[in-house]
Structure formats: structure tokens, C-alpha cells
Amino acid sequence: MRYPAIDLADAVVLVTGGARGIGLATGEAFAAAGATVCLGDLDGALAVEAATSLGGYGGGVDVTDRDSFASFAGAVRDRYGRIDVLVNNAGVMPLGGFLDEADTISRTTLEVNVWGPIHGMRLVLPEMIARGRGHVVNICSMAGKLPIPGMAVYNASKFAAVGLTAAVRRECDRTGVSVSAVLPSAVRTGLASGVPLGRGLPTVDPEAVARAVVRSCRTRRAEIPVPGYLAGWDLIAAVTPEPLLRLGRRLVGDDRGLTQLDPAARAPYEDRVAAQAAARKQT
């Protein structure tokens, strides 16, 4: 399907989780293309600082809270009149054994990684559809295609996000609005702190993911793996005999989130997620 073109030099882009990592890199990439960048993040002060450096708008947003998301999206509309591109990037990735993970952490993972995109799309898609143009990018993960030991609930959240994106894309057929899933492999950000990367595990920098997000505004592809050579890997896995697949996974070390984790290096990130979970439990 052909979609109305989005002129990035005149576009208003909203990025959640925009204060660091993939979100910040995405904001920088859109700003370099001439777009007006609006960064929302649970750390509102950091989002304001980052957005100001890009000549845009920043503020606090809790993507699990529809009212908070609506308030930030409304502030963007009040300031710029519309939202042309929404990037649902905010996410959390706790690591550890499934049976060891606290329910509060599991709920937070699902609320951020699944309900965040749900809230974002329900708040922004109606205005895009009314205008007959717009683009939504959900930052999913290759973990939404392939199960990985040590991140069972994160896996579940990303499988859900991939399916959600595909279904909403179909519902938006013939509206002029596109919905894409970007599926990074391991990314060198705080989410992966304490995990040994590389050594057979496809690993990219956040800037590579950001470039894929910006390109999606032109290509409007349904799914964009990063790196690109991972396209179709889920289909290969589906037809590979399980013993051979298990051997390959073991050689790559797909369980390194369980067996090779550096607890001290990982602790600051896990503590931040735990604090978010505790705060939500009190509300």
C-alpha cells in the first residue's frame, strides 16, 4: 500500500523513553533530519534537558498511566498542533529466572512494554486517521520472535507487542496511517548492563536502531529487524529440528542473561525498575 509521504523537515515526532538509550538516539536522528522532536520520559527533568538540546520539547510521562500519556500528548498538540510520528520506545527489561521474578516486576514489565504502546496508539491514532496521514513505530525486539532464557516475562511482553503492532497495522489499512515494529537484537544501552554482549550474540548500538526508525518513515515496512540480516530468523527457527536449534543456542550463549550476568554491574538498572514497580504498587 502507498502511504502519504511524511516530510521529516516539517514533522512533529513524539518519542517515549526519550531521555536515554534508543529513545535519545532516535530523537537525535529525527532532529538531524529536521523534525521537531518531543521527548517524554519517566525522568521528566532528563527529558527536558535532552529535548532542549535538540531544540524540541520534553517532559515527564508515565506510559503505564493513560492520563499521564494523554497530558504529555496534549501538551505536544497544544504547542505544535499535531503529532506526525509516534515512537513508542519506553521499555523495561528485568533479567533473571522466571520463578525468581517478583509479581510486581512482572506486572511492571507488561504495563510498560504492552500497555505503553496501547495507550500511545489509542491516544494518537485517531487524530492521524482523521488527517489521513501519520506513522507509528513500536520498538519491539527480536525477543518478540525468539524465546530467551532469563527474560521470560520480557519475552511475553515483546511477543505481545509484535502481535499488537501487526494487528493494529491491519486495522489501519486504507487510512493513510502506517504502524511498524522495529525489532532490535541486543543493544548497547542500560537495559543490557551487566550482560556480556557480542561473542556470537547479534549486538548493535542505539544509533543503528534510531536509523531504522527514521528509515521506516519512508519505507513504512511492517517489521524491521536490526541488524537486517535477522529478517526471517523466526521462520528458520520454526523449521529447524529442536536438538540442532538447542545446540546452536547453547553455542551462541542465549542463556547468558542467566549464566553470565554481572550482578554488580546490573544492580543499578534492576534497582531502577524495582523502584518503578514499588511506586506503581502504591498508586
Predicted regions and their residues:
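Residue(s) in the substrate-gating loop at a strand-loop-helix junction
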Residues: 141
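Canonical Rossmann dinucleotide-binding motif of NAD(H)/NADP(H)-dependent dehydrogenases/reductases
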Residues: 3-37
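Active-site loop immediately N-terminal to the catalytic Tyr-X3-Lys motif
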Residues: 99, 148-152
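Substrate-binding pocket helix/loop in short-chain dehydrogenase/reductase
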Residues: 97-107
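Active-site helix of classical SDR
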Residues: 121, 157
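The beta1-alpha1 cofactor-binding region of Rossmann-like NAD(H)/NADP(H)-dependent oxidoreductases
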Residues: 44-45, 60-71, 103
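C-terminal helical subdomain
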Residues: 181, 197-234
